[in-house]
Amino acid sequence: MSAGNGTPWGSAVGEEAWAGSGVAVEGSELPTFSTAAKVRVGVTIVLFVSSAGGNLAVLWSVTRPQPSQLRPSPVRTLFAHLAAADLLVTFVVMPLDATWNITVQWLAGDIACRTLMFLKLMAMYSAAFLPVVIGLDRQAAVLNPLGSRSGVRKLLGAAWGLSFLLALPQLFLFHTVHRAGPVPFTQCVTKGSFKARWQETTYNLFTFCCLFLLPLIAMAICYSRIVLSVSSPQTRKGSHAPAGEFALRRSFDNRPRVCLRALRLALLILLTFILCWTPYYLLGLWYWFSPTMLTEVPPSLSHILFLFGLLNAPLDPLLYGAFTFGCRRGHQELSIDSSKEGSGRMLQQEIHALRQQEVQKTVTSRSAGETKGISITSI
């Protein structure tokens, strides 16, 4: 078995580092750089290149100034932060995982062990919390389209703040453990940080809930409320509104095409999050409650599932690129429709003005004839 990470936050490395097939040392076996680990490293490098390029492009696209906007829209701000979270996963989690599988043991020292485990979990938290913020923003945009969007920055600050605070225990749980023998071995583990097995299981379950279960429930609630609101009969009724309200609503009805694309993008991000990480977290749950499964499940399966989870970071910029292309087409169609509508209005106004001129001429000629008749009669 390779040395790598038992879970996305690496808290099960202690057991994995000393178990499995490898080099026998004093009656036990140490991990080796197996063929499965080599494939994992190769795929991780491909994911790193694609994720770094895609998310850097998204970050540049959403942060560059727009001529038509004084400041970035809330949607662009949200996806800028999501790209930053994906880049944190790209530049911390992926290189750490690849390097650790190559070196097998930990060679960077105790301080780097604690710091990198902290940054790794913070990256995972931010990548899980920011889709929740996007879901809350989409919910507010649909349920209260005329409301203020000033709360987006507070939600973003809360997401990053929670990511930092919840990852802090990693600084105290992880440390380096040295093993003497014919083949000296050092590993970055949580071994000895928990007095009992149930304490480590509780910490893992808490991290699992914060990383996966709670964000999933929050996003499911947000999008369920959106679907119920959009499909409700009151939302479909627009003809019974007063004229002024109808005109205001019509001005917003041109925007929902873009809002709908943003909603679809957010839903796709939720689906990719579920599809990419659910299998691996289920495997982690199985391991926490049945540690003996580590010797029953082939190492290649854990490698595949973890790589499938890392696929989430490269997919986000592809989804955003499709969203941006759709928005540009939508804006072009909207501008064409607006120009056609404006031309039609101008034509109607000209016809109405000509008709008024004809009516005025007719009235003037009639009044002139009546005046002439009266003057002749009087003579």
UniProtKB/Swiss-Prot annotation:
GO molecular function: G protein-coupled receptor activity; peptide binding; protein-hormone receptor activity
Cell membrane among keywords: yes
Post-translational modification: Phosphorylated on the C-terminal cytoplasmic tail.
Keywords annotated in UniProt: Cell membrane, Disulfide bond, G-protein coupled receptor, Glycoprotein, Membrane, Phosphoprotein, Receptor, Transducer, Transmembrane, Transmembrane helix
Cystines in this chain: C113-C188
Membrane topology, Extracellular segments: 1-40, 97-114, 179-204, 298-303
Keyword Cell membrane: yes
Record's subcellular location: Cell membrane
Transmembrane domains' residue ranges: 41-60, 77-96, 115-136, 161-178, 205-224, 279-297, 304-323
Leader sequence segment: none
Residues in the Cytoplasmic compartment per record: 61-76, 137-160, 225-278, 324-379
One Gene Ontology cellular component: plasma membrane
Glycan-bearing residues: N101
Membrane topology: Multi-pass membrane protein
Example GO BP: cellular response to hormone stimulus
InterPro entries tied to this protein: GPCR_Rhodpsn, GPCR_Rhodpsn_7TM, GphnRH_fam_rcpt
Record PANTHER family: GONADOTROPIN-RELEASING HORMONE II RECEPTOR-RELATED, NEUROPEPTIDE RECEPTOR-RELATED G-PROTEIN COUPLED RECEPTOR
Function: Receptor for gonadotropin releasing hormone II (GnRH II). This receptor mediates its action by association with G proteins that activate a phosphatidylinositol-calcium second messenger system.
Stated family: Belongs to the G-protein coupled receptor 1 family.
The name this protein goes by in its record: Gonadotropin-releasing hormone II receptor
